[in-house]
């Protein structure tokens, strides 16, 4: 079944460019994300917000967002090794490896655009600092996973306008990679949380 028949509302919402170029996997993930994570009205608001999209603002905000994830991972990895769940440790290691690499890539992409846009970077940096203060009543493993779940959801929400508004193939590829990898990890996080709440 083609993308138009599988998710018919996406043609008008995502636009012809994305329907022509994005993979079925990405379209399915975006559709599932918009329906399951964002409130219905918020999902529709992305359509009107696409006109105000800029690559510079997206990259600047995502750098701060990624830095927040790296900070959370480092806080977790600073806990005693004996208290770390091996799966959570692997996730934290992967967050640092992948997101530090993407931070470097985004900084390179920003160079011809004028560098970091503080009006996009600073609010996200502040939001990440607030998030880092949350969940202190939880154990280290549960805290990291519980924080990563909304953190990843925010990354998906930030990436949708990039798919809608960017004309830069590298940024489109970055946004697609974020959606695919972090949606997959969100499913894993939810399964881990459900399993460990049973114990």
Segments and roles (model prediction):
Residues 3-18:
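Short, Lys/Arg-enriched N-terminal segments with co-localized hydrophobic residues
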Residues 13, 32-34, 92:
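Helix-centric, low-specificity signal for extended rod-like, repetitive segments
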Residues 17-27:
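Bacterial N-terminal signal peptides that target proteins for export
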Residues 18, 38-42:
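Sec/Tat signal peptide C-region and signal peptidase I cleavage site
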């Amino acid at each position: 079944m083609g993308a138009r028949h599988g998710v018919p509302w996406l043609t008008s919402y995502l636009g012809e460019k994305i329907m022509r170029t994005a993979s079925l996997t990405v379209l399915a993930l975006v559709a599932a994300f918009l329906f399951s994570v964002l409130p219905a009205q918020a999902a529709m608001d992305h359509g009107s917000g696409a006109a105000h999209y800029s690559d510079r603002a997206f990259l600047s905000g995502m750098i701060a967002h990624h830095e927040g994830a790296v900070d959370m991972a480092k806080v977790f990895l600073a806990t005693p090794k004996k208290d770390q769940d091996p799966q959570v440790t692997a996730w934290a290691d992967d967050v640092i490896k992948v997101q530090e690499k993407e931070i470097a890539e985004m900084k390179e992409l920003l160079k011809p655009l004028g560098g970091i846009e503080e009006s996009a970077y600073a609010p996200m940096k502040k939001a990440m600092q607030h998030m880092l203060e949350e969940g202190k009543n939880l154990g280290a493993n549960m805290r990291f996973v519980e924080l990563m779940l909304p953190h990843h959801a925010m990354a998906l929400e930030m990436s949708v306008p990039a798919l809608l508004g960017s004309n830069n193939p590298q940024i489109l590829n970055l946004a697609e990679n974020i959606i695919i990898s972090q949606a997959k990890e969100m499913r894993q996080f939810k399964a881990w949380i459900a399993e460990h709440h049973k114990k």
